[in-house]
Amino acid sequence: IAHINVVFVKEHNFILNKIFALQETSGITGLEHINSKSLVKLRDKSGTFIGTRMGRPEKAKLRKMKGTPVVLFPVGREGGRLRSFQDAISKNTIVSDFPTYECNECNIATIYSSCELCGKKTTWKKVCVKCKRTTLEDKCCGTYTRGFRRQRIDINHYFDSAIKALNIPAPQLVKGVRGTTNKDKIVEHISKGILRAVHKLAVNKDGTIRYDMTEMGLTHFKPKEIGTAINKLKELGYEKDIFGELLENDEQLLEILPQDVIMPSCPETPDETADDIFMRTCNFIDDLLEKHYHLPKYYNVKTKEDLIGHLIIGLAPHTSAGIIGRIIGFSKTLGCFAHPYWHAAQRRNFDGDETCALLVLDAFLNFSRKYLPDRRGSRSMDAPLVLTTVLVPSEVDTEVHGMDITDKYPLDFYRAAEQCKYPWDVKVLQVKDVLGKKEQYEGFKYTHETNDLNAGVRLSAYKFIPTMIEKLDGQLDLAARIRASDLDGVAAL
């Protein structure tokens, strides 16, 4: 192999050192070098870059427990693989843990707190774990009694009595649970499960119907973005736009009220949209009121526009305090748009957090603390044990108190950012500056215009790629294409 030695004269060394970076530089950037020569000071246009990645995909769907039960009623092993009442009925009886009640009017034992024959309130009897006798006392034979016992019950009797009381044909499939997990093995009335099956709804562990959604913040909206008529918005209190002009067209910009919520109704989603689920939930509750409780209907919903103005409860998974919200419209996204206050009242923010919504009347009629699993955390978390009806900004999570509410940032802000100073070194109007004043509820400003909140990607590829392996392959392929991404770093994560 031939080697060629190239010799350069000394005066060319400077150029070669620059080209091949053979010498260490002085440590100044190109911009600093230009400014050292220029009479006009140039600013850094690019600023500071930060890298981000998707934490979790968007979500808006009905919550379903394992097996998709429609009622918190145990069918035991007799319910088969599907845990269905139809399979259990074919076996006539089922064996599981049930509470023991007695009807003094009919002189019969039952598993309900009200008699399925006469409708009168029954007496709850406790069971001694030693002598097996029923008693009203908390103690017997020197030990504590418990509120249930292992029983073989005639499932046909309870199912047929429910169908007769409701006066409707039996659904083809009604699914229960293998066994209840609450302390006293309290069960839901089968009538509720039959009506949920009719309306194709699923029950949650506390007896309610939940719709899970990704949380998204919003302070302003246009009527065209949420599909609500001008007259309806006026009825809800939106009479003027942010400039003080009377509301007349769907292009005007409105400031959302702190407890108003825009629900998701994405046409591209493979899951059922919020309007579909809540319409069916309203119809279920109306049937429950009329056929089970013998009361007049309340919602009378026929279209999604009929849902506008109705109240919901927002509840984060790790809390036990719900906040009242009011439906004012539907977006075409897969997220729950609401005021930052409303999310903060649930101790949540917008970094991929998830909340759920349930109808107020659903919680009032069907929620019971006695249904909750007897496990640490399950006894109190993700359950509407407390309900906040009026949102007070000073009482919500303090993270939102640091939210900027100005329409522009001063020059000092950009100079401070250039010098990497702390955010609190520059005075910018924030929520904490208006707490306790009228301005804490209205008059918020923003810095960037948005033509339509429904624009952009409404359904990411992550949602419809079928398998996890294909999702990972897609993520790595994207990382390989993006020059700013480190493929090895993405793979390591």
Task: Report each predicted region and the residues it spans.
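Conserved core architecture of multi-subunit DNA-directed RNA polymerases
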Residues: 1-493
